[in-house]
Amino acid sequence: MDRTLESLRHIIAQALPHRDPALVFKDLNVVSMLQEFWESKQQQKATFSSEGLVVYESMPSSGPPFVSYVTLPGGSCFGNFQCCLSRAEARRDAAKVALINSLFNELPSRRITKEFIMESVQEAVASTRGTLDDADDPSTSVGAYHYMLESNMGKTMLEFQELMTIFQLLHWNGSLKALRETKCSRQEVISYYSQYSLDEKMRSHMALDWIMKERESPGILSQELRAALGQLEEARKAGQELRFYKEKKEILSLALTQIYSDPDPSSPSDDQLSLTALCGYH
């Protein structure tokens, strides 16, 4: 623990040289510190675009408690975990959670290395009650995770978050299973989706999947949305990374909106990501 704290102080001294490491998390100006931290990273590595480095979102509310989310470069999302009586307080609290995670992300243990991959795969095998042989089988979820980690060697876990979230969503809405049935390999799926960001286009495509599910099983959308809202709130109050839960909520809400506003939301669009394009390899 002492070694971790010392590493954090060193990271703060490097990334925020004008700040006192002992006072960083007590400073009310944590919003500007978070921005300063990621601007410093961009200057050092030129990893992310300068547009929208750190994005905040306040949830509509007529009164307290207020909820605020902050999305970081690379796709990770955090929210305020305390009960906040003002929007400004919620924004500061979300920024504090994001800053703590951003600093921890700089620790050597958070970078994807061979040792990190080995430990992560072992944890995945244990959680799925599988075997280590699954890690070498790209048709399994553990094998796909192993392949994704190896494809992102050298990145930190926050930099890897967006791709990870995309595949969590594809698994959740059944797309991975559908692709497996069309004989698309997981490597092809990973290579294909690595080209895309999780944007409105991808959300619209996934919302269409859920509209089809609603037609087959009326009521499933509302059921999934209630579950997603509960998961999001629970994870936020625990100070956890939120992107997967938040995207589920956004996609399901979009699907419900389209059902009530568009008489034929299943009409294909040139803007939608096409699984046919992916499976056209075969």
UniProtKB/Swiss-Prot annotation:
<dbReference type="InterPro" id="IPR051436">
    <property type="entry name" value="Autophagy-related_EPG5"/>
</dbReference>
<comment type="similarity">
    <text>Belongs to the LIX1 family.</text>
</comment>
<protein>
    <recommendedName>
        <fullName>Protein limb expression 1 homolog</fullName>
    </recommendedName>
</protein>
<dbReference type="InterPro" id="IPR029270">
    <property type="entry name" value="LIX1"/>
</dbReference>
<dbReference type="Pfam" id="PF14954">
    <property type="entry name" value="LIX1"/>
</dbReference>
